[in-house]
Amino acid sequence: MVVLGSTGSIGKNALKIAKKFGVEIEALSCGKNIALINEQIKVFKPKKVAILDPSDLNNLEPLGAEVFVGLDGIDAMIEECVSNLVLNAIVGVAGLKASFKSLQRNKKLALANKESLVSAGNLLDISQITPVDSEHFGLWALLQNKTLKPKSLIISASGGAFRDTPLELIAIQNAQNALKHPNWSMGSKITIDSASMVNKLFEILETYWLFGTSLKIDALIERSSIVHALVEFEDNSIIVHLASADMQLPISYAIDPKLASLNASIKPLDLYALNAIKFEPISMERYTLWRYKDLLLENPKLGVVLNASNEVAMEKFLNQEIAFGGLIQTISQALELYAKKSFKLSSLDEVLELDKEVRERFENVAGV
């Protein structure tokens, strides 16, 4: 298999599962963590390696592997790979072209890069995609019973770092505080996306493209992250998916469903140790971006705008140029502005063009 983004949280877990399942690693890619990819090269001996920045070439120790550089280099590497499976764990819209290239080459795509579906779900062949995500894995597991007819799909949210912060203090929070996730250990972008509820907006759009544009889709807060998904059926019964908060479960099924079903990759749940599972609505007062959920489901192509404005605001937030309120404000302004416009988005180029336009427009907007 090919692992793109091998030095991140998902990538490291994927390599752990691949080793356990005896899956050969044909190719690896990383962003800036050259020290770690050098270690991974020693262990997994890939035939091909891609890095983002040519200035890192001097520090790379490829041990005979063919080396590719930049996003175009990743595309070229995928083109040459013979593996049937590509796991795309690149962060941000940077992973979009790699998803397209993998599907063009008729490869199965294990997709951890949320931005691919969020920005271009209408252009991707969903039949070749397995989402690497605890919520969508939960929905997939619940929908295996074909006798029951689903009516609504519900995913859970932890509430993120500011779920108990006094409302009047949320806007002034900094990145350091946003990175204190109560349940999961993840990369910085997804942890902040969890605090802003952007991550759940992403997952709502992913659910729309993956499981059905005709079903009701919603989310709720379940603080323990033990409940990942719920499906309500036409008979008004609801089935719930519970599992430990561990990404190795969805990753293992994306790599090899048969082996995953026979080998436990996560700790069993101790049902007696569970606190009372409690569901809470997502408060629009606390998570102001949640008010755009219905707008995004009505016009899912706005996902490009959501993602581009979020990435621009995220960079400023991490660089301490704006506080949390500024991040929220940037995304709100972008969605309000583009909700009034119409756009086709019938090709990858058109998606990337709109992405660029949104970035340029909001790059220089002063935040709170």
From Swiss-Prot:
Mn(2+) binds at residues 133, 135, 203. Its cofactor is Mg(2+); Mn(2+). Keywords: Isoprene biosynthesis, Manganese, Metal-binding, NADP, Oxidoreductase. Its EC number is 1.1.1.267. The keyword Protein transport does not apply. One of its GO terms (biological process) is isopentenyl diphosphate biosynthetic process, methylerythritol 4-phosphate pathway involved in terpenoid biosynthetic process. InterPro entries: DXP_reductoisomerase, DXP_reductoisomerase_C, DXP_reductoisomerase_N, DXPR_C, DXPR_C_sf, NAD(P)-bd_dom_sf. Catalyzes the NADPH-dependent rearrangement and reduction of 1-deoxy-D-xylulose-5-phosphate (DXP) to 2-C-methyl-D-erythritol 4-phosphate (MEP). PANTHER family: 1-DEOXY-D-XYLULOSE 5-PHOSPHATE REDUCTOISOMERASE (PTHR30525), 1-DEOXY-D-XYLULOSE 5-PHOSPHATE REDUCTOISOMERASE, CHLOROPLASTIC (PTHR30525:SF0). Belongs to the DXR family. This is 1-deoxy-D-xylulose 5-phosphate reductoisomerase. It comes from Helicobacter pylori (strain HPAG1).
